Amino acid sequence: MRFAALVFGVGLSLAALAAPRNADAFERQWHLGGGVGVADGKGLTLSPALAAYAAYGLTDVFDARVEVTARGYHVGSDHNPNALSTMVGVAYKLDVLRWVPWAGVYAGYLAFLDSPPKGSPFKQRDVALGLGVGLDYGISRQLGVGVTLRFDEALSHSSATNFDALLRAEYRWGW
């Protein structure tokens, strides 16, 4: 009788372990967040950056993203140009428990609110391509924090580059 109970218990345990679980995929999930950090550009100095972004989970591994970044450049003179960029892109993410590394490609528009400094490779307005990487940490299903590194290059001039490093926080919903 004891042997039968043991076999039944082990069999029930194995069946429970083999049963399908609910997936925690993130397709159709919305993200809304912001970030603060620094920006650096060719011919410009390290300066503050502020960003806002939205993302939508196309699948459990791909997000569509829209990002707006404001940069307050300081060039060591009275002329301190501010810049805005709006980028749209697709990111591939690798969900690993609470840590989510990701990488994305972007295309968008870069605009200096004032004319860029003389001798700078930047135009006042330009189309840009970008590459971004990040590491997010899920505090909860709804809240996350992370770090983002993004490199943008203006299409009109190959040496017109910009680099952002941001600490981010986001709210998620809609799964």
Residues covered by each model-derived region:
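Gram-negative (and chloroplast) outer-membrane scaffold detector with strong preference
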Residues: 53-132, 137-143, 165-175
